[in-house]
Regions:
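Compositionally biased non-globular segments, especially hydrophobic aliphatic-rich helices
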Residues: 15, 20, 40-43, 53-54
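Generic cytosolic/nucleocytoplasmic N-terminal low-complexity/intrinsically disordered segments
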Residues: 2, 18, 29, 45, ...
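N-terminal export leaders
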Residues: 23-43, 47, 201, 261, ...
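General helical structural elements
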Residues: 10-13, 28-29, 33, 50, ...
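Structured, non-membrane catalytic/scaffold regions adjacent to prosthetic-group chemistry
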Residues: 52-404
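Short, intrinsically disordered low-complexity segments
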Residues: 5-8, 23-24, 28, 45, ...
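N-terminal secretory signal peptides
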Residues: 1-26, 35, 49
Length: 404
């Protein structure tokens, strides 16, 4: 209370250079008043707005409250009112692509991607693999070649790792000379995050007995194109998994059923699906997928053939193109940030190129290569923002992928 006996008013909010982003000091001072504004709300709903007063008997009994509900199905699916929350089989221009299924990030919240909505890319369709017949063979420069089935792998001690998987070509529209007016799904939909459970590859290699001269292993999938990639042996002993579960379920067919290689932080194509072969070698295979399909052309025409790590990155998920904002007020700007190194220091955001603000986030180093949520409130007065831009900063100060 003030000396005059009147309840003091909270200080006026400070804006950052008129661009709508709230000053962090103002947020700290007004933390109670504006707690609602810090909630990661769905775009289209004003956060921190006062509710309309109603009478105590305003609720009426709708039809669903007056009859028995349906019998729960053997496999639960989302409500019929969520029918638009689906993957899209198209490129960013909306052209049909039967090999691309993009995650609807702008319609989701949190960091775990539901299995049915996890992105997938398949070079030769989704194979219908009988797990009773599928085998994984480890051979090459080993003391004892070994063979594994899904059943035998299930007998080993299993470990779980939270990790994102991202296509090397994700966010390609950001390199367009003209900004594309499309959703976060269309631009950034080729990345998803899950809890993967399986057997550490190092345990299987130790059992096989790897020759000290083996510096690489070649991972090959059982799809009709036999995708293969060369991986340094060191990665196998760091954190590689032969994954057989995805968010507690056996892998989805589009994500590698019955088993896949998981290389946290590495390009998606290196996380070989339908894993059937691991061959220990002293030289990389120099296959089509690593010399052409997934190599980078550098200035001057040279090719960077073995670029593994997915660098620090963030993008805005809400609001996204096509989502309506219900009048002026405060809205949560939400997104995700991730890095192949697992060392994100902060994420920054600006509206229409105004002053820069950090997004609110708690980065837990132990979480490693997994997507992490970020959010900040943004004031939308009676004006229009052309762009909201975010970027992640690694602990060493490195910045990559500045996206609006």
């Amino acid at each position: 209370m003030s000396k005059s006996g009147r309840r003091g008013r909270a200080p006026a909010l400070e804006y950052v250079a008129g661009n709508g982003l709230l000053d962090r000091r103002a947020l700290l001072r007004n933390g109670i008043v504006f707690a609602g504004a810090m909630t990661a709300g769905v775009a289209g709903t004003r956060t921190g707005a006062a509710a309309e007063p109603v009478a105590a008997d305003a609720l009426k009994d709708e039809e669903w409250s007056l009859e028995f509900g349906s019998v729960p199905p053997p496999v639960q699916t989302p409500s019929q009112f969520e029918k638009d929350v689906v993957r899209t089989l198209s490129n960013p221009k909306g052209e049909f692509r039967n090999s691309h299924a993009r995650t609807p990030h702008h319609l989701l919240n949190g960091t775990i991607t539901p299995n049915p909505l996890h992105f997938s890319i398949n070079h030769c369709g989704v194979p219908n693999i009988d797990p009773a017949k599928h085998k994984l063979v480890i051979h090459g420069m080993v003391r004892q070649p070994l063979e594994f089935t899904l059943e035998t792998l299930s007998r080993y001690p299993l470990v779980s790792r939270m990790a994102f998987v991202e296509c090397a070509g994700n966010s390609a529209p950001m390199f367009s000379s003209e900004p594309m007016q499309v959703t976060a799904q269309a631009i950034h939909g080729l990345v998803s995050n899950a809890e993967w459970t399986g057997v550490p590859l190092s345990a299987l290699l130790d059992e096989a007995g790897v020759d000290a001269k083996a510096k690489w292993f070649i991972a090959e999938g059982a799809d009709a194109q036999f995708l293969d990639r060369s991986v340094p042996v060191k990665k196998a002993y760091d954190d590689a998994l032969v994954a057989i579960y995805q968010n507690g379920e056996h892998l989805m067919p589009g994500n590698g059923y019955p088993m896949r290689l998981l290389l946290p932080g590495y390009q998606g194509n290196m996380n070989v699906k339908y894993l059937r072969r691991i061959k220990l070698v002293d030289q990389p295979a120099m296959s089509y997928f690593e010399t052409k399909a997934y190599s980078q052309i550098l200035p001057g025409g040279k090719t960077w053939r073995f670029h593994f790590l997915m660098e620090v990155k963030s993008f805005i998920t809400q609001p996204s193109f096509g989502q309506a904002l219900n009048g002026p007020g405060f809205y949560a700007i939400s997104g995700v940030a991730y890095s192949g190194t697992g060392r994100i220091a902060k994420v920054m955001v600006t509206a229409d190129g105004g002053n820069v603000q950090p997004l609110r986030a708690e980065f837990v180093a132990a979480r490693g290569q997994t997507t992490q949520p970020v959010t900040t409130p943004l004031a939308f007065p009676n004006q229009h923002y052309n762009s909201i831009t975010s970027w992640g900063v690694e602990s060493n100060g490195e910045i990559k992928h500045v996206y609006a």
